[in-house]
Amino acid sequence: MATKIRCTDEVIVLTGKYKGKRGIVIAIYSLGKAIVSGINIVKKHQKPVPALNKTGGIIEKESVIHISNLTIFNTKMNQADRVSFKTINGKKVRVFKSNGQTIN
């Protein structure tokens, strides 16, 4: 089954601490989770590894967020939108539900 949200899509967060924030999807995992740039920032306490010449400290990085808390952002209409699928020339493509425009 094709996913409605893919890597490099611009999404908006629907619920939680980051509600209303937008970001670009960096990675999608099989358990229905995604990493979005600038969203769900956590602090990781990293130990130094002298053998690999890595310094320790507190590192801020993006953590996973469930896909059900995200929706795709339609930049043409400047609002959150839903996704449907259509078959065009024998190919299954994603389209916005509000205006029927294809998503690249």
From Swiss-Prot:
Any GO MF annotation of the entry: structural constituent of ribosome
Pfam families in the record: ribosomal_L24
Keywords: Ribonucleoprotein, Ribosomal protein, RNA-binding, rRNA-binding
GO aspect biological process, one term: translation
InterPro entries given in the database record: Rib_uL2_dom2 (IPR014722), Ribosomal_uL24 (IPR003256), Ribosomal_uL24_KOW (IPR041988), Translation_prot_SH3-like_sf (IPR008991)
Domain of life: Bacteria
Any one Gene Ontology cellular component term annotated for this protein: ribosome
Sequence similarity: Belongs to the universal ribosomal protein uL24 family.
HAMAP family (UniProt xref): Ribosomal_uL24_B
Quaternary structure (record): Part of the 50S ribosomal subunit.
Function comment: One of two assembly initiator proteins, it binds directly to the 5'-end of the 23S rRNA, where it nucleates assembly of the 50S subunit. One of the proteins that surrounds the polypeptide exit tunnel on the outside of the subunit.
Stated name of the protein: Large ribosomal subunit protein uL24
Gene name linked to the record: rplX
